[in-house]
Amino acid sequence: MRSYLKSIFILLLAGGLAAAQTTPAEQAPAKPAAKLGTHATADLPSEATVDSFLHQQFGYQADLTWKISGIRPSPVEGLAEVTVVLASPQGQQLTKFYVAPDGKHALVGEIIPFGAKPFDPAKNLLEKGITGPERGPKNAPVTIVEFGDLQCPACKAAQPTIEALVAAEPNARFVFQNFPLEMHNWAAKGAAYADCVGRASNDAFWKFVSKTYETQSDITAETADEKLTAIAEGAGVKGAEIAACALEPETKAHVDASIALGKSVDVTGTPTLYINGRKVGSFDPRMTDVYKGLVEFAAKQAK
């Protein structure tokens, strides 16, 4: 679904298609945020301008709506970064485009790190900021960090491949960081429960995550507390204590810090993996051999 909507977004913007009537999704205020390499000197377009631009691009497609999630300076000096949530019958996708300093051109694509060691900035940020449950040797030459959302179908689909990758790689340490997406109505609650389970028992955490993904389609916003409490109990911790912990301000602070860490390294969707700082943003279970190659290459580079 992520790749489908992203492809539609790129094709429509790149093709310059325009104009018919639709009703955009209700807009959220722009949320400027600092991150590594951000240039605060960029001239930011207004939400009204961005909305008009999107209306001209997508207005003819009645089943496609959008919500402006953020407008802020990009990592590249002079470029403004616009984050938009696109919604269609296929689902929702968080995506970005960039506005040139002249305010008359937009760039569609991904800004990637460049340099002799392009992945070191993200690697260093993650090494300092990761707090999630982990598996594998502490001194492993490779650290794989997953930013995940327990309500995310793509995360559920990716888990068997990620599990196999971690199990087969003695060179890898694996860390899970909560990154609940606003578009999912019980994801934040799931992250709070997961945070509490992880602090209570590292072993129970992995059982909790596995069972939550397994029963994901049975959980709703209305039943989340009941279901997640039972899953926590089944994972080997006291469900009632976890439910109480999930409501504590400290827990929300932990989850918010994990989200902030993800945003600092440019996480925009889930699952997103980092292999020693190298971003793998579109996880495809069919590419297991490629991911193994990335881990092995990172291990050699770390020597």
Regions found by a protein language model. Name each.
Residues Y4-G16:
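Bacterial N-terminal signal peptides
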Residues L125-V142, V166:
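A short beta-strand-turn-helix
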Residues Q21-E47, D51-V108, T229-K303:
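C-terminal cap of thioredoxin/glutaredoxin-like
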Residues G78, K138-A140, K189, G269:
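Residue-level preference for short coil/turn positions at secondary-structure junctions
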